Amino acid sequence: MNESFDKDFSNHTPMMQQYLKLKAQHPEILLFYRMGDFYELFYDDAKRASQLLDISLTKRGASAGEPIPMAGIPHHAVENYLAKLVNQGESVAICEQIGDPATSKGPVERKVVRIVTPGTISDEALLQERQDNLLAAIWQDGKGYGYATLDISSGRFRLSEPADRETMAAELQRTNPAELLYAEDFAEMALIEGRRGLRRRPLWEFEIDTARQQLNLQFGTRDLVGFGVENASRGLCAAGCLLQYVKDTQRTSLPHIRSITMERQQDSIIMDAATRRNLEITQNLAGGVENTLAAVLDCTVTPMGSRMLKRWLHMPVRNTDILRERQQTIGALQDTVSELQPVLRQVGDLERILARLALRTARPRDLARMRHAFQQLPELHAQLETVDSAPVQALRKKMGDFAEPRDLLERAIIDAPPVLVRDGGVIAPGYHEELDEWRALADGATDYLDRLEIRERERTGLDTLKVGYNAVHGYYIQISRGQSHLAPINYVRRQTLKNAERYIIPELKEYEDKVLTSKGKALALEKQLYDELFDLLLPHLADLQQSANALAELDVLVNLAERAWTLNYTCPTFTDKPGIRITEGRHPVVEQVLNEPFIANPLNLSPQRRMLIITGPNMGGKSTYMRQTALIALLAYIGSYVPAQNVEIGPIDRIFTRVGAADDLASGRSTFMVEMTETANILHNATENSLVLMDEIGRGTSTYDGLSLAWACAENLANKIKALTLFATHYFELTQLPEKMEGVANVHLDALEHGDTIAFMHSVQDGAASKSYGLAVAALAGVPKEVIKRARQKLRELESISPNAAATQVDGTQMSLLAAPEETSPAVEALENLDPDSLTPRQALEWIYRLKSLV
């Protein structure tokens, strides 16, 4: 049965009618329907869940004459199953029993209390602690895109307005949302196809007036001018849809979402999707996290610090005042790293705990962790007090001390609370007098039972008599089978065992009712007091969020100070002059994974030396040299120290890489097509302040086509765009470029060849390489010896036919394309314009004489 089409529920049982009505409100997502200690799924949901979760598919009786497919999960294990579903991009509506079964006529009242979606989760068990979990919305009109992201676990709300498809693709790559909302008429489906968590939304949710109204209502403002987003209509359309979706799914107020920020391209270094992928910033080319820049740089001690560092890495800032401030802070903190990090580690993930507090889903252990974080603040304040740095003191001030909330939680919550409030024992003794009284009554049962047992033994003279309790039958008096015939007349039999009889007496029954009532009252009061704690803590929310942000930033900066010291990094110098000058530069990741010492190399790019043509053997280190330059620039522009002896760096607006390629089979694009698409993006968007890495342009096509393209690209970058360019190539003909244009220089990575073996020197030298060592590298890779031998024969043949094929000279026919374009011969022009079919024999003879004179 497909319940989405069956709107007539009258043939079904009352319980299934209730289920189907709730399911009709959430047709696209799974419905977890609470029945006692289980969440049940029925019909199509049950079939899907059994496949997604690998749980048994059973049947539950029949309704409307058909057996009902059913699958269920225990309520106490729901978080594990939700995590599995969310990781697969599924959303789930959680339906709880809100009525009392004892007083309900017919099915117990139920309602959907929350909707769990990949982009709106805040539960600790469902989130990866060191990664942001973003919900995003995308909007498109004739002028460009609107894009909004929200991290519900921190309240961070951002919007941007990418102007074109490439910029939009780069934003999707950078933010990597867990869930993406798009309009039902979204035109560029190819841009988002294959992404996880896609959600199609109706057009009206993106309506601009509704968006402004929703946002003003959320922030308690009359307009959005104060946020700097008033005129960002495309971005606001996306933000409005996103906020509406969050309200629909969370079904509670969102006090931690207090502002929205515009992300402008001119504020950060722009990197397209290919560049982020090629530089392996937070994800390697295989999709893992090993051997990435973040893996080397991230030794933060709090999850919120780790997430902030990754945001910095993906959005390097161009404001050198901010960068110099970060550098100064890192320098000032280097002497206190060993004292600060152990204390910061105890702060934990305050940012996400605060989000759960705002959503009123924080659990007792969240509040205990929050208390523990507050308890670290005095020591952090004391340690930072002596640091002579204005930025550090500003962070110290933002951290606050929160003595009042700390005192409240120390009084209210026991040291090691249980997981859930409903388990009881969360509120500390002494916090509330009435609660203590109910607990005393419930807990005083042991003393009473001991006294009752002694009294009844003496009264009856039965030495086997004892008083006990179990969860099924409650309190009882037990007498052995041998003495049971002596039980007094007022003993009412409650249970018969193999060797004993159990009884109840009116006094014990009355006490049992009182104890059970007191336990229930204690639990109800405890729940009420717990909810009141939220009301007492929430007025501090804005200051607490500021504190969490300051603590995360402190963690990042202390981490960068530790990394700089441990990895021997240096503080780069920013200059207004264009260019990059690096002394003894190293690749931050490669140097960590190598078993032998890394060979450091210099680099000098300036307006007078804008392009380096890099030649040398495969495996010689060309790609490493290029990538290390980009990574050093990237690290400098997050304010970090860098792996080099000395670095001076000028303004950079974009980093481009055209490094390596693979077929994009899903889009039907070959390696060469991918390569040319990325190259076109660079040639259209690079400026004189861009850093461009071009590796092996033109290798995916024929030699002459590839060489022609590589030459023309290099010429365009050096002469027209004037970008700072590293251009690696195996076309030795390109080493003649420095002779033909200004601002271009040759460098090479050397190797030594001895017989069939080759030693890579990995050091960068001025000038062009003498040869490519391709056969030696092939031998090293294990190509069979007979193939290498045949290749050497063929190479000698080719070199004898065209001595220039493997040399750096550019004479002869192969390099004619590099000479100035020749003027067309008059004789050729005349022949091209000639129509031989229209000539008489006499005219043909005259033409021969005329052509002879033109040659």
UniProtKB/Swiss-Prot annotation:
It comes from the Bacteria. InterPro entries: DNA_mismatch_repair_MutS, DNA_mismatch_repair_MutS-lik_N, DNA_mismatch_repair_MutS/MSH, DNA_mismatch_repair_MutS_C, DNA_mismatch_repair_MutS_clamp, DNA_mismatch_repair_MutS_core, DNA_mismatch_repair_MutS_N, DNA_mismatch_repair_MutS_sf. GO terms for cellular component: cytosol. Pfam families: MutS_I, MutS_II, MutS_III, MutS_IV, MutS_V. CDD domains: ABC_MutS1. ATP binds at residues 616-623. GO terms for molecular function: ATP binding; ATP-dependent DNA damage sensor activity; damaged DNA binding; mismatched DNA binding. The keyword ATP-binding applies. One of its GO terms (biological process) is mismatch repair. Keywords: ATP-binding, DNA damage, DNA repair, DNA-binding, Nucleotide-binding. The keyword DNA repair applies. SMART domains: MUTSac, MUTSd. PANTHER family: DNA MISMATCH REPAIR PROTEIN MSH1, MITOCHONDRIAL, DNA MISMATCH REPAIR PROTEIN MUTS FAMILY MEMBER. Belongs to the DNA mismatch repair MutS family. HAMAP family: MutS. This protein is involved in the repair of mismatches in DNA. It is possible that it carries out the mismatch recognition step. This protein has a weak ATPase activity. This is DNA mismatch repair protein MutS. It comes from Salmonella paratyphi C (strain RKS4594). The lineage of its organism: Bacteria, Pseudomonadati, Pseudomonadota, Gammaproteobacteria, Enterobacterales. The gene is mutS.
